[in-house]
Each structure stands twice: as structure tokens, then as C-alpha cells.
UniProtKB/Swiss-Prot annotation:
It comes from Pyrococcus abyssi (strain GE5 / Orsay). The gene is rps4e. This is Small ribosomal subunit protein eS4. Residues 43-105 form the S4 RNA-binding domain. Gene3D superfamilies: 2.30.30.30, 2.40.50.740, RNA-binding S4 domain. One of its GO terms (cellular component) is cytosolic small ribosomal subunit. Pfam families: Ribosomal_S4e, RS4NT, S4. The keyword Magnesium does not apply. One of its GO terms (molecular function) is structural constituent of ribosome. GO terms for biological process: translation. SMART domains: KOW, S4. Belongs to the eukaryotic ribosomal protein eS4 family.
Amino acid sequence: MARKGPKRHLKRLAAPTSWYIERKAYKWAVRPRPGPHNMRTSIPLLYIVRDYLGYAKTAREARKILNEGKFLVDGRVRKDYKFPVGIMDVVSIPETGEHYRVLPNRIGKLILHPISEEEANIKPLRIRNKRMVKGAKIQLNFHDGTNHLIPLSEKDNYFTSYTVLMKVPEREILEVLPFEKGAYVFVTQGKNVARKGRIVEIKKFPMGWPDVVTIEDEEGELFDTLKEYAFVVGRDKPRISLP
């Protein structure tokens, strides 16, 4: 028999290991709605309200808080408790003045890193690809599923793996951070997840093999990671606070 649409359920034991939730306390978990991030690199908004921040004891209480519009993601009110909040997203609570950025820690778990109100208006976006669209415009497609249009004359300022510092929620480009030697990067996946440092070398391989970058951390230690795991967050120093 053919499938009747996407899966709607998720057992806790099968939930991504990046989530900080109790796996044996209950049978079912909240399955994030299809959206800006994939399931492995995001977490449902309900868990942020209840399990991460402790503003609710039950899912019902968490949904009530969200329905009152008390939580913002990237400067916009989000009421959907299944909304996927992923890497580099900013979670804000205007009533308490709290602001957090979603980042992975050294064991690959998604955490809420406290940030200032000023930094909450800045979101780094990694360019996945770009393409031409109607009206002689170039569409930049970012890691969080969003996109942005730029004039054709500016196409040579933006390339794959570059990072755009976007002002949210206005969606205004503040700065472009190139992926090059000397750039400051944060590793988002792999065995070196959450490590940070400056790019020393970019190794390119033929025949479809993924590119590798060599990074020097703050202690002077060198390590390698895949290019797609390295997220540029600054030129000679990070433009955002990191854990």
C-alpha cells in the first residue's frame, strides 16, 4: 500500500541525539514540522519552552505560553509548538529580556547560548547556493531554508560557503564574511563539533570528494574537518559570542 503522506509521529528513543530530552520517561516525542531546518539540526519550539528553559511543566502549558505570543524566533512571533528552531537561530523572550542563540556543544547536543539584546538582532547565514531568477536578480539560498534577492551586479560578492550577517527581523544584509584562509569558523557537525578557530588551509579534492579545511584553534592545535561543517563567523575574530 502506498504511503499517505509524511510521518506525523516520533518515538523518544528514535529522536535525534542532539536533543536534550529524557528518552525513557515517555513513549512519544514531538515531531518537528517540516520547515527551515532538518530534524537533526533543530529542535521543536515546545521543548525549548518546557525542557530547556523550564517555563512550563507540561506540553499543554507550553502551548498556552506560545499561543500568547511570548516567544520570538529571529525577531518574529512563533506560536507553532512544532516549529523547528535550529543552528544560529535566535530565541527571544521580550517579557524577561532573555535572548539565546541555538548552537551545538562539544558532544553534539543543541544548547541555548545566552546572548545580548544587541547581538540578538544579528543572525549569521551560510550560503548554500545561488541562482538567477526573474527580474535579473540573484537568489541566495541559506542553510536555514530562507533566501534573499540581490542585484545581478553584486553576484561576485557572494559565493557558496560565504556567511552573510543578516539583521533580523528586517532581513537586511550587514556584512559578508568570505570563506578563506584566516577566516574564523565554528564547526557545526562531526567529531570536532563546537570547536572554533582560524582557517589555515583549504584542501580541494577531485572526483567528487568533499573539500577539507585545516583549522588552528585558540590553543594553537591543528585539526581537520569537512568544509561543509565549517561555519564562518568572523574574519580575524568572531562577530558573535560562542560557547
